[in-house]
């Protein structure tokens, strides 16, 4: 196996048995690809901005004399880069410029000729751009647009499952859902009449829409019914026989022919009878008159002589009419063939309840439903109906919708028009009637073939189109009214509606969310999330169990584990590891092709619709070396069911065992041993882990850690191979290999690292280099670790030595006992960065001022401020300290003559202003790490702002100068090589400045040209460098674009270091969460016979009922991994020979059935072995992939190799008494996380604060500085103890006795510790409530 430079530093021992067939795809591709489609010009006009423009343009004027045509578009350059936008609170976006063509026609009587053409580029607002990591910067904050899983456009057949009507009758319905436009529903009522609804309005008989489509009754009956033809011969009625139509009927007469009786009267006609009639080729039978009476005639019968209608179509035959027909010479009568079994008379019955009788009346009926109260005119009714389903502007099925529509109706063609036509509507009605007749089945709405994913690009395109449509109306009016000769395209387009639509979507849509940035995993999961909520989706309240449930088609597409607990369960899902969307937006998952039992390397992506036709084997099916299945019978999935199939029947096989789970769930080792509910919690809690100060890779991982860390974008990854030329805390410089260099470039890659930046969740983002000077690196290697990563692997928590045992009740109910050593070693210490801002506004009374001259504030309080009134960087501040001094003008107060005199004498200003400084919130203490000042254009900058500007300029100049020097030295190395090849002495040259080297006269023409070329390159580089500095300088010194009325904003960043403490929440990766109950001295913790104490004591009772056994297996394997690490550490300490070290590590890697990983350490140099050993001395990292992990015997092998008992249990001693505990205890290493539920953020104590307006009781919650609720049960407790005075205090002065509490406050101030309880306000509220019911209630005083 070939290892990259980073992987060689620390190899993970892999217990995976199945070979890796397919690499994990780039995890953010769903976001990036979707947005790329939106933004890149698509010549086919199917996607993105191009599609939106083409759907709206050309815009014609109402009079048709002119039109505005779309030519092309381009996106301009962004003003600020991503980091600058975040600092300034700006949106990272690019201006959209569209080339439009205005064509003016000269109208003749016969034709229009082009009179004038004007082309112009028009600005159409800003389009937010996606960063490289799949996020958007909107107003300075990082946001993610979550993909939406919505009902695919198309036609769906469904039923109410008998829930609507009290009789329990199943009512069927069909719904045509377009991508945009009106919905069309068909539904049966309990009387079996078929109705239609447009846009869920009032229902109409289905015949109305058929009449509106220009069908008359006769044509409607012809379309939907088969005919029975009765002939009248010699006063006898003869039926032209189609034998199948008799099935299931009871013969009401003897069915006979030529004297032979085939079915006796009263007998049920069976398939045997029908076959007999067919065999004897009986084409007609004589029937009694009763048989024809009551049947429904399929067409109008009109007397040819008189023109009188004898019987209209869809009317029952009676004896009287039969006679009339005979008289008028009709000897052949067509009736509808209907029966109760499979040919119901639904359309015929519906026609009877329909009051309309022609197209016009049907159109008027539709108009009345859609536009109630408006008078219908012929033109208006026709326009409305035409626009509803047949106009491309108002109705769009989309390519997906048309494909689904045609597939549902079993048509061969998948393409077609994007609007509906007559055939579509008729075919849908036919199919729903077939379903009602028992042919065909209803669709499963929760099948992933009926739900598609709408990603960022598509949603942004829809919003953009909405904006364009708003502009279209205005343009049409301008084209009709304006003076066309002077009009230019620029004059017609107003970019505001477009910008507003796009801004609204990115800023306030339910699916554009504030990014969850706790750690790299939470970022990735947020970007891969799929929500059923949002515009055009479901709502929480109305979503039933079926939608939320796991469906068989989720396999390999949507994770069955990772979903939130609570009201959103099942509505918000996560994409599976290998899943992707196809061109239609349906989720698909990869499979290996299988032919005659041979598994090939060929990979096909199948959507849920295609998958149903195949038999698919699981990933853990046994295969021999040649690729054949070893077992005759293989467990497979087919049409959502699992069963055994012959190996030769199998069509496909899963790609990987972790195919079904999401990224979050695939990081849980031994997931297969955990209960699903706990696995769900585990997957969700990993996202809440706070990045620790010192990262620590998980000893027991799943092999997904590297993929997550690299794809999340928090690490710095090498773009090209090369050698590390320079490293410091903030930058890495790589000299690129010549093979990968572009022509005319210096061959240097510079990576600037992010230092101590605030994340959305106030955690700290910081990158640290993990390469050294002179090291050779390859493309894709990790150069710097970000938050929660360790040597390019995801590291969310710490490996802790845990023991499962009770300890004096301190681990009752999931509490956790932690050793003090964990605090001392800063294992779970985290840094949180808070941004506090102070805004200086222009008020009616004058401008607020930021200064250190604050009224009534002592010297001590101002000691940390500079002369501009802003805190120093590096100052340590606590709650209540002033960060930014600010004074606000106060309204003029009436002054006494004495005060006026004093003011006139001393010119005192202090009383004009009040202190409104920015202070540190209570309970927060930390270090100021950065200050940013934003000043409005035209407002004079203070001294501190200028200092900050100078510092920034210096830093940028220094950075760019260093960058330039590196490029320059690279160029001169080139020149030196050229000189050396010409045997020119370079010692003298070294004394000359670089620029003079270019003027050295060289005889060889080709070499001279090369030097000239390099000189030109040097000149260009210098110019570019100066240009860069100038651009940066302008950006820094220009005024900021602030909100109206804001003069200045000062942002102060505080870094708070938080150690772990009682009350903090911790968890493992298996849903085993708990709160720290006590931090115990190291000497009191249980220890083993070597004197090593445990770090954490967990309650063993937390395991059996919760069924997350994965944590126990992780503990055992962790113990073995640490044991092997200890042995390597011992060998390093005793300076064993490197050959012995190599052998030992090789043995460790060879343990177990390593079918996937074969490590050969002979290819490693001695230095590499030493470096590897140093990284393994704290434990050998292990990978146990999901559903393909380490087996029990392998864990035992590992324990044995580490020299530990194979039971995984050891004898422990009590730290306090030194006595043995009575039985061996499970001790091992578990990966523990500190979650972002810190006691510091939750705990507060109320002194005196705000009260509720109505009840006058204290508010609740930390945000309102609220009190503790003393509820009903607490009152019972005090009553039970007979603590009457305490109870009285709780119900009055401590709660809502307004007078009592004021008096008590006064008494305490006076030193009089007495209280007089009065009437609680809530009692008065109760009185008023009773009075509002009309009952007078008064209190009598004794």
Curated annotation (Swiss-Prot):
GO BP annotations listed: DNA-templated transcription
GO molecular function, one term: ribonucleoside binding
EC number(s) per entry: 2.7.7.6
Top-level division of the source organism's lineage: Bacteria
Catalyzed reactions: RNA(n) + a ribonucleoside 5'-triphosphate = RNA(n+1) + diphosphate
Presence of the UniProt keyword Lipoprotein in the record: no
One annotated Gene Ontology cellular component of this protein: DNA-directed RNA polymerase complex
Keywords: DNA-directed RNA polymerase, Nucleotidyltransferase, Transcription, Transferase
Top EC class for this record: transferase
CDD domains: RNA_pol_B_RPB2
Pfam family, one: RNA_pol_Rpb2_45
Keyword Calcium among record annotations: no
InterPro entries in UniProt: DNA-dir_RNA_pol_bsu_ext_1_sf, DNA-dir_RNA_pol_bsu_external_1, DNA-dir_RNA_pol_su2, DNA-dir_RNAP_su2_dom, DNA-dir_RNAP_su2_hyb_sf, RNA_pol_bsu_bac, RNA_pol_bsu_CS, RNA_pol_bsu_protrusion
Known role: DNA-dependent RNA polymerase catalyzes the transcription of DNA into RNA using the four ribonucleoside triphosphates as substrates.
The family this protein is said to belong to: Belongs to the RNA polymerase beta chain family.
Matching HAMAP family: RNApol_bact_RpoB (MF_01321)
Binding partners and assembly: The RNAP catalytic core consists of 2 alpha, 1 beta, 1 beta' and 1 omega subunit. When a sigma factor is associated with the core the holoenzyme is formed, which can initiate transcription.
Alphabetized PANTHER family for the sequence: DNA-DIRECTED RNA POLYMERASE I SUBUNIT 2
Protein name per Swiss-Prot or TrEMBL: DNA-directed RNA polymerase subunit beta
Organism: Buchnera aphidicola subsp. Acyrthosiphon pisum (strain Tuc7)
